[in-house]
Amino acid sequence: MQFDYIIIGAGSAGNVLATRLTEDPNTSVLLLEAGGPDYRFDFRTQMPAALAFPLQGKRYNWAYETEPEPFMNNRRMECGRGKGLGGSSLINGMCYIRGNALDLDNWAQEPGLENWSYLDCLPYYRKAETRDVGENDYHGGDGPVSVTTSKPGVNPLFEAMIEAGVQAGYPRTDDLNGYQQEGFGPMDRTVTPQGRRASTARGYLDQAKSRPNLTIRTHAMTDHIIFDGKRAVGVEWLEGDSTIPTRATANKEVLLCAGAIASPQILQRSGVGNAELLAEFDIPLVHELPGVGENLQDHLEMYLQYECKEPVSLYPALQWWNQPKIGAEWLFGGTGVGASNHFEAGGFIRSREEFAWPNIQYHFLPVAINYNGSNAVKEHGFQCHVGSMRSPSRGHVRIKSRDPHQHPAILFNYMSHEQDWQEFRDAIRITREIMHQPALDQYRGREISPGTECQTDEQLDEFVRNHAETAFHPCGTCKMGYDEMSVVDGEGRVHGLEGLRVVDASIMPQIITGNLNATTIMIGEKIADMIRGQEALPRSTAGYFVANGMPVRAKK
């Protein structure tokens, strides 16, 4: 089998590339996905409110676990990643958050990455998006990804939580992806007007999968990339339960889009990475790149949970006897409780003036429950998910075997810097202050977690060690740049090799201030134009907020 391009991984970036490259009917593309289809009648992935379900099994989730995390009481921590058409956009929380403009401007300060500034990237965010209230300087109106805005009156807790943040002295913003990210406001979500999850399989592949020049193979586990000298010329993979490899050749390029955990793993198995690590598994060295699998970053978060004194939370939706009605409303009308992910309000703040842009993110949820659906509080409640955005902690992904089915060693080194501890202490204390504002007085009952007895630095630190969880945002393991630990250049091309790019969240040099899916899609759109040799979209002229040392909040 011969194709112009072989794409490994049908996730948030891979599906973008598959769709854009096959717009040219003379370009042939093979898209390999280790998981299965995105079954449209499976409510677990299609109903926004069911977002916890895919994380509980292994049909749609790689269900990785970390090595014992040394600063988290040696806990082995969850590291869920999407498996199936759509990748992690098939199982994520559907929050459409792009990050802060200064994240991208910060990337662009690295030599060679100048065209990754916010204003250079904004046209590609817009290209990918159809926002339900129409386009403007910041938002698109005819892109493949459906973005839904929060509507007033859905749940009084959303408005109350935003108002409480404002009463605590923080800004109000009407668009966390617009002129000003900093502040509290409604949260956009990747949900269709029909109340379905807007994964990249739905948004992109639906328009491309019938093209004769696109071949999609599911249940295709990539074993390794084939090289001729320093040039990538094809891919070998295992189909289903087969132990006999299948191979295809790429006339132009192999595009690795397997995500921050699997992309470095595939490079290492293919002979690209740290020479000592590869020698340990008798993998012939194709090219030494010590940065492959290093620079691993993530967002860590905690839940601060409160009893709700009024019966307005989602607690009744957790009762089995209410779920048939919720399911029917969603299935036949695309409406009701099932049609929202219920992350409809949130915010970004600076915990201290020393941060030039927000370093703390909030997601508000009108129920008290773990992200993966476990440990639901059996009463009316609500919670804040809160965590730091740009931790200095760095980890790694390293193969443990040549077997593609063997999970790699993953270590995030969460909370390995004093800055991490200070940010989380600040975050808990600020959150408590926000939760005790007048806007929440009629709803707020007792603090369920951490509990009012948890007050000192030592007590807060122990709570974080035992209870903080991943926000499922791994990135950075094939970082873009030109220093000795970089893996790809500013166009995603792997240093020292030909015919091979990495295009996914692994190339982010530094993690962004917010959820990763929107920016991963943008990366796919931007590099798709580079691959095709097309001129970049014209730079945006939109304005954006810069704090420039402003106080973090208004004085009361």
Swiss-Prot record:
Task: From the UniProt record, report the name of the gene that encodes this protein.
Answer: betA
First-level EC class: oxidoreductase
**Entry keywords, A to Z:** FAD, Flavoprotein, NAD, Oxidoreductase
Q: Which catalytic reaction applies to this protein?
A: choline + A = betaine aldehyde + AH2; betaine aldehyde + NAD(+) + H2O = glycine betaine + NADH + 2 H(+)
| Upper taxonomic lineage | Bacteria, Pseudomonadati, Pseudomonadota, Gammaproteobacteria, Enterobacterales
Q: Which Pfam families match?
A: GMC_oxred_C (PF05199), GMC_oxred_N (PF00732)
Q: Which residues bind FAD?
A: 4-33
E.C. designation(s):
1.1.99.1, 1.2.1.8
Pathways involved: Amine and polyamine biosynthesis; betaine biosynthesis via choline pathway; betaine aldehyde from choline (cytochrome c reductase route): step 1/1
Please give the name of this protein. Oxygen-dependent choline dehydrogenase
Q: Does the keyword Hydrolase apply?
A: no
Q: What function does the entry list?
A: Involved in the biosynthesis of the osmoprotectant glycine betaine. Catalyzes the oxidation of choline to betaine aldehyde and betaine aldehyde to glycine betaine at the same rate.
Positions the record marks as coiled coil are: none
**Gene3D superfamilies per record:** FAD/NAD(P)-binding domain (3.50.50.60), Glucose Oxidase, domain 3 (3.30.560.10)
Gene Ontology terms, cellular component aspect?
membrane
On whether Transferase is a keyword of this UniProt record, the answer is no
* One MF annotation (Gene Ontology) recorded for this entry: choline dehydrogenase activity
Annotated GO biological process: glycine betaine biosynthetic process from choline
